[in-house]
């Protein structure tokens, strides 16, 4: 920057020597200086690399340059001699700072903002910022200062354009120009002449006037294209012009001497004469001691010529000099992605953004006046946070077990924090620092939202917008709950208390009312019911109720007695909660205020007095003040929750805060980890969480049916469970990994499960046909029956000290006991109504009774001393005592997992065995495991299973793969051990590892669920090339995609094709597929690139739905679902036989595994197999498997054989498709949209042939006439013109050669087929009303002797006798017509001969080819007709001898074959190809024009798109808005979004910057509120929907595209 400094100093010196100044201007991307006398030279860049610099000014005396950047929404500065050092001056609260001016005397910075419509001032460093003007401003732009007189001037180009003047202290505001003005842009002052100059870009003039607006005169008029900024130096005016991209100048008096100073400016913006003369020195009234002001000292036009002022929101004290210490009353506002504060002390109501990070979806907000913390909830971060009022000291308060915290309230007296959670449906409390958390209310809550507290009385109030909306009240400890209002409510969103008058106010977003009542529910009345379309946030302070409105995008307030309303903030989107508060005033007290009421943890005040409470995991001891961690306690599970009860006190049970529990059944714990485990038979999961409810996770999610029994192996850290539905006992690690089936044979409804890890035994009960209690080693071995004669035993538990078993018998209603061998049975209790769960601790047994709805206790040996521990409990499923004595002992698995790689399973006599996950095998070291290499995979609708044929292993397990919705087909890559499947719901191909990890979308629709682009049907993997071949039901093609998701392209496509099932044989280079063409299904074979296509079978098929092949046996298998049979053949199609056709109902999948062919029958829900050798016949493999969809065999991969495949290494060197030829070498090929290049390895773009041409895939010939395509003769060197030829349509006749002709030409006496097959076997009988021509042709009898030849042999006009003399005129007419026809025919024939045979053909290099052709064409050439080769002479290399040439400008008026489909290029010039290969005919001389880019409908850019700083926008500087149009409406301008409409509806919504249109069908069902309203200023690129579709669940907004809906929805827990 040294050169810049030297230039600046030199130029500044020049200014002193001559009258021409340096001009400082903004160029959007940089700031520059240019010499006004030599503007043709390059300008000097002062600051570069800017985003969108608009306004610029300077303080010459301090060497500072300031500019505004509208893209970064900031004002910045730099020093002359340090221009590489850029400082931020103002970075918040700006949207479009269009104007900027420096007060060089008072050292202040003034600016205009055309988005916020404010004029502000601050110190030169950006501190002590103050809003001067905020009313009656509409698009303020240029601003100029006159510090010596204390005046400021600005332009306003809004609805009422004008130029105003005011004191620099905000006083004496006056409009000085308001006529003949439209777009006043530039503004400058002549300090010597006391004149005001301005430029109008619409009216194209520069005018001047006195500083008070009088004596207005034109300086330049009519010759200004688009003046923008204006400055003055001595006698010359300078301005920037947007149209000419230049700086111009003229005489300031006369306007003469108009000239261009500097041109070729990228985007000229603001401009100033950079000179000390433009900032003359004068007396500074603020120069001494800042004028005595504590904060701001601003110039004023009235004595004493200055005025003290305070920063925004702060009042000036009565002495007129000193500002108060901040605002005394604030309005705190939560927006979606930021928090703001608004001072209620001053009338400007300026919102100031707090400098906080990572706010994603703030909802509720509250304030603690004692410590000065703001508290807020974030629905997306799922946390409660706090910070000081200036944004500093940000902390996370609560982060665990938070779902959707919609309401928050501070108890400033007891120092507690309350919140509602509409995800967990709970109201909870904690200390203000987030410790000592406790659930207060968790029952009968649907959608709790707003919550307020009255610490002085001891009540809390909350709203619930569930199915039955209501407002409730309870004591601060959750007791004494009562409903205050439950009628005439819709969406009660907001709630506020008036402590002085004892009333409670609320706002309803559905009824659109603000109502009030007494705190006891009496005296209900309406305060406001007009123009409040959607209330959300709600608060009260003093005499005013404040609220936010989503739809109006506003904050308003109403006087609580007079009902007078006032808008505080308008057009601010994403409004959520708000809180009006006194900053320091603290009201009220209660006994909890002093020493926390004597409580060790929580002090909760009630109307009856304080109550000490304990957080989760603690219990209150006898003094009722102190909380301790109990040594032991009872845990029990009910349907929807898990609770605990103290064994030492009489306190009520306490719910453990767990979310999402549906139907908890079995329960256990791990005392060392302080976790609980439970099964959920509704969710079909096994879950765990810490005792405080945190870190909840599902450890087993797949393959469960009714997991009624479960137990924790606390030594081996394993989890055991019994599944009554699947009849299995399984084990895994505590985190669900390494799952293995231990017992599956001869199990009949296993139920309760108990473990004795120290001894190595497990015990379980069975409820089947012969109920019993069994025992086995913990690895599943040594199974034996202990108690055979028993009813349905449940609650099996072990007394580890006395070595006895206990259980309840549901059939006899007894509690019994035996020793560990099942002997010495004793009845402990016999007069029980309905005992169910059971546990033991010390000298007692504890059980649940469903009839008594109780938990009871009795002596474990005698059954005496029975006591009811807890009553009024419905359907307690399981019970246990949480204590370390229940998990004692030791075995070798407790130490380093027994050094096992996976599972360590205890066995009797202190031993252990290492276990492996299901289907894994234990290695010779007896420690480690190996994954299976050979197995079967089969899929169901929402699961994929693995099966092994091993008597020692459980046959099948469900793989833990998430998000399976509708699995249609599966395949497996044995190299990477990745599973691939088609999801027909998402219309995608996905892959994942067997353990569910590394999930990935391989092929997916770009637009989900609408206008489906793809619809995969079947897939097959080429493991050598690493490709997936898949058929698409939507586009009817065979597509190829790399395993990493990169597309290769379509390899097979035909007009009539319907490829469905597919299997590849990469060892031979072929693929086989079913082609379900209408009325003619086929099984076909083609090379892997789609060439060499042949039909193997077209008869004896109805719906061939599945394919399989065995490459080693050389066999192809298929299943026909309509014919209900399975067939096979050789891979060539020979030796077709029916393998099985009996008792097959709906075969949908086939696979070959060893010597067996496996298939799945969807209707019979069965997997079967048949021995292909015929020795063992047909066998059922597994039955009762619902919703089967596919099956696939995985064989062990021989790496040596794999590496020998020529395509396995780098895809054989091919860029796309690698095929194996018969000799074992490779051939590279390409998908249909590409062609093979000359290196015969790489694919590239095809040559550009005309629409009337066909592009050969490879070879030296690029283009041939499309009429030669599929004509039975090969012209392309690679024969590609005769590949994939379409089947003739019903209206056509297929010649023996495959050529298609019009069916009407069959047997017409002329050979239209090149092989003349259309005239063979033509013995046809004509109808009664037809005449038979001599050649066999049939024509209507009325055409006989009608003077018109109808038979091709003219036989219809032979032997005719005229009946009357023809009129001469008619004869002349007929003759004329015939003459015309003959003339046309002769001309056409000559033209055809010229074009086809005689005209020279151009090579690719432009040389003339001299081959001549003679065509003997028929009298008429039907569309698509190609002459027989015998009628042609001449030949070309690579074409059939005697082939005719058809010009690209065909005389037949159109293409004679299918359109060019390999390159999909239309409208391109054939001469544009870079290929040097030959073309069969000359290129079109004048190629068609290229497609034009559609122009924007708007030629004028829109401005800064949002009123919200948080909204991301990409725009350039906005010149003008369309101010004569109304601003965009809100997404729903009436209550249409709030009112009733169907939850399921079709909606079309189009939004532009000028408004919205929507098409919505409504009915009477309530729905959530509309999305958060957008700003008035919308980007032209943005599209917004109006009312969103109604969610079907409470969490429909979980993606946070919109604020949380207050619609009545289903419970989300």
Curated annotation (Swiss-Prot):
This is Low-density lipoprotein receptor-related protein 6. Disulfide bonds join 286-297, 293-308, 310-323, 592-603, 599-612, 614-627, 893-904, 900-914, 916-929, 1207-1218, 1214-1228, 1230-1243, 1249-1263, 1256-1276, 1270-1285, 1288-1300, 1295-1313, 1307-1322, 1326-1338, 1333-1351, 1345-1360. SUPFAM superfamilies: EGF/Laminin, LDL receptor-like module, YWTD domain. Glycans are attached at residues 42, 81, 281, 433, 486, 692, 859, 865, 926. InterPro entries: 6-blade_b-propeller_TolB-like, Cueball_EGF_LRP_Nidogen, EGF-like_dom, LDL_receptor-like_sf, LDLR_class-A_CS, LDLR_classB_rpt, LDrepeatLR_classA_rpt, LRP5/6. The modification Phosphoserine is found at residues 1420, 1430, 1490. Residues 328-589 are annotated as: Beta-propeller 2. Component of the Wnt-Fzd-LRP5-LRP6 complex that triggers beta-catenin signaling through inducing aggregation of receptor-ligand complexes into ribosome-sized signalosomes. Cell-surface coreceptor of Wnt/beta-catenin signaling, which plays a pivotal role in bone formation. The Wnt-induced Fzd/LRP6 coreceptor complex recruits DVL1 polymers to the plasma membrane which, in turn, recruits the AXIN1/GSK3B-complex to the cell surface promoting the formation of signalosomes and inhibiting AXIN1/GSK3-mediated phosphorylation and destruction of beta-catenin. GO terms for molecular function: apolipoprotein binding; low-density lipoprotein particle receptor activity; toxin transmembrane transporter activity; Wnt receptor activity; Wnt-protein binding. Residues 20-1370 are extracellular. There is a cross-link at residue 1403 (Glycyl lysine isopeptide (Lys-Gly) (interchain with G-Cter in ubiquitin)). A motif (PPPSP motif B) lies at residues 1527-1534. It is a single-pass type I membrane protein. It is linked to Defects in Lrp6 are the cause of Ringelschwanz (rs) phenotype. Rs phenotype is a spontaneous mutation that is characterized by a combination of multiple Wnt-deficient phenotypes including dysmorphologies of the axial skeleton, digits and the neural tube. The establishment of the anteroposterior somite compartments, the epithelialization of nascent somites, and the formation of segment borders are disturbed in (rs) mutants. There is delayed ossification at birth and a low bone mass phenotype in adults. GO terms for biological process: anterior/posterior pattern specification; axis elongation; axis elongation involved in somitogenesis; bone remodeling; branching involved in mammary gland duct morphogenesis; canonical Wnt signaling pathway; cardiac muscle tissue morphogenesis; cell migration involved in gastrulation. Residues 1394-1613 are cytoplasmic. Expressed in early embryo. Broadly expressed throughout the embryonic ectoderm and in nascent mesoderm, and in endoderm emerging from the primitive streak. Homodimer; disulfide-linked. Forms phosphorylated oligomer aggregates on Wnt-signaling. Component of the Wnt-Fzd-LRP5-LRP6 complex. Interacts (via the extracellular domain) with WNT1; the interaction is enhanced by prior formation of the Wnt/Fzd complex. Interacts (via the beta-propeller regions 3 and 4) with WNT3A. Interacts (via the beta-propeller regions 1 and 2) with WNT9B. Interacts with FZD5; the interaction forms a coreceptor complex for Wnt signaling and is inhibited by DKK1 and DRAXIN. Residues 631-890 are annotated as: Beta-propeller 3. A motif (PPPSP motif E) lies at residues 1603-1610.
